[in-house]
Amino acid sequence: MAKAIFVREHGSADVLRWEPSDPGAPGAGEAQLQHTAIGLNFIDVYDRSGLYSHALPLIPGREAAGKIVALGRGVRGLRIGQRVAYVLQTPGAYSQLRNVPAARLVPLPPGISDEQAAALMLKGLTAQYLLRRTYRVQAGDWILVHAAAGGVGLLLCQWARTLGAKVIGVVGHEDKVSLARRHGCRHVLVAGRDALATSVRSLTRDAGVQVVYDSVGHDTFFESLDCLKTRGLMVSFGNSSGPPPPMAAAELAKRGSLYLTRPSLFHYIESAAELKAAARELFAAVRSGKLKIRIGQRYPLADATQAHQDLEARRTVGSTILIP
């Protein structure tokens, strides 16, 4: 029988259990995938810990790649054996087999490996909408990227550089500085060592940045606001240090008539057409060499506990893949 990682109670990484799992036959409009690579993301930690509420038991994981092994009634345009990938709002990717709505599957083109796709569907599509839709980065823009050596951060910095932006990256440790520089950062700051707002003001000649991409949350929120230029945009899209603290709307005016948004990938790929258009642009950027996918760690799916512990301790670099 196939196996999966289960969460039967919310808590630390120790609650993850490797157990038998039978998804059954695919239903109408579904395809059954045999996973070949699964992406690890901080949202999986939020699901496991209970920050994001789901009914238990829960199989974590939002993105994966694999091959189709069965098709449900009414599915058109897909075939048995085809390589596909997905990102879903519903967890369930930490499994060897999974039934997935066929309309949410993206066929993989030549030149995109299963591991690349598993590292790209959530993180890469996140980078795509942040840079191309939430704020359309232009040549000459100063931008600030937190967690610049992480999976999303490395993609954001590379892509922004190809768009002509001047990228300031923030990393958690000294040993990640050179990696961030190689992936598009003009300047790299180290959290806890460099005074963030003071450093950004100095680098931008006191102008501030047009946009901050902040996936850290609680620990960086207010200082990120202080890095923005007048009418700048704060994009808060993650909670790796915990949710951002409460803030009165008047704070935005006091700091320069700032804009604040809290976007979600799934609102940018609501339709199949939006999903496939975003994936086409993303895959084209990878195949052209504009984006390099760094898979820094690979773990057997059965070792998901260790993978979660390393992610939470910030011992990972780039993307992390779980192998079923």
Q: Model-flagged regions — what are they?
A:
Residues 171, 219-290, 324:
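Glycine-rich phosphate-binding loop and adjacent beta-alpha segment
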Residues 272-324:
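C-terminal hydrophobic helical "lid"/dimerization subdomain
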Residues 83, 142, 166, 232-233, ...:
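Short glycine-centered segments of the SAM/dcSAM-binding site in methyltransferase folds
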Residues 22-39, 49-91:
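Glycine-rich beta-strand-centered segment in the early N-terminal region that forms part
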Residues 161-220, 271:
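Adenosine-nucleotide cofactor-binding segment
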Residues 46, 86-149, 159:
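NAD(P)H dinucleotide-binding glycine-rich loop of Rossmann-like/cofactor-binding domains
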Residues 152:
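Hydrophobic/small residue at the entry helix of a nucleotide-binding pocket
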